[in-house]
Amino acid sequence: MSSTTTSQSVSPFELFLRRFKREKLAILAGSILLIMVLMAIFAPFFLSQGLNDFDYDKILMPPSAENWVGTDLYGRDLFTRLVYGARISLSVGFLSVTFGALLGSVLGIMAAYKGGWLDTIIMRAADVLFAFPSFLLAIAIVAVLGGGIVNVIIAIAIFSTPTFARITRSSALAVLNSQYVRAATTMGASHFRIMFVHILPSTIGGILVYFTMRVGTSVLTAASLSFLGMGAQPPSPEWGAMLASSRDFIAVDGYMYLTLYPGLCIFLTVLCCNVLGDGLRAALDPK
């Protein structure tokens, strides 16, 4: 009897935490991402060199005790630029996916709740966007809007929206005829309250998992656009822009560190986001 009472008194959030604590790799990935975020935020407090401190006596210096990952072709400290670059790369990833998630969630829940012609229009529009490879769609959008970080965020948000709409719609349809939604309808709750107070919370799990994974993909997409000259422009320390400015040294012996470390930052971010997303999925939806 006591065990039954104890199990009933545990909240869903507590159950989630218990399951998530078993996901050691996800916790490690989340810790690495947290360290990267904190380093990016507090960069001015622990970095001794400025973002664009030129030192022509230290041009293309290899990693050393003074310059941990070396210097670039202008004598700037690469570690400093990588940390400041995390501000841009992580911000682009987070903001673009946030905007896509907000818009997609609203469209998805409206499609599920209203149904009919509105559902058809929203889902067919999503199908049109799904017909194009996401990266090519991002290139097309940036080509129309012009280069720059803001337009990259807009482009990534646009092609992130359909998937969030699909996830939200699917989750919302699963609870649309549940007892608590029917009770809210019977009590005269407004459509807005039913959609965003009673239905939306049940979709958060799927949204959160995809959101986490999508941030990593968005960082990679933004870096790719910058590498092609369509995103952040030099002297921006965005990781893709750093790769672009050092592309002539990719195959040059002794200077591979110029592209190695920005590439590792991108790889580590994408990997950690995917591992964290897998851990969240396992904790939210145990099989």
Set out the residue ranges of the language-model regions:
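Gly/Trp-centered helix-boundary motif
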Residues: 1-105, 109, 117, 135, ...
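Residue-level recognition of pore/gate-forming positions within transmembrane alpha-helices
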Residues: 36-37, 101, 127, 143, ...
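Generic hydrophobic transmembrane alpha-helix motif, especially the helices
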Residues: 68, 72, 78, 102-104, ...
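Amphipathic cytosolic juxtamembrane alpha-helices at the membrane-cytosol interface
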Residues: 76-91, 95, 115-123, 176-177, ...
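Alpha-helical transmembrane segments of multi-pass integral membrane proteins
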Residues: 92-96, 111, 126-127, 155, ...
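Hydrophobic alpha-helical interface/terminus motif in multipass membrane transporters
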Residues: 110-111, 141, 168, 181, ...
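Non-cytoplasmic
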Residues: 136-140, 144, 148-157, 207-242
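Alpha-helical transmembrane segments
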Residues: 161, 165, 218, 269-273
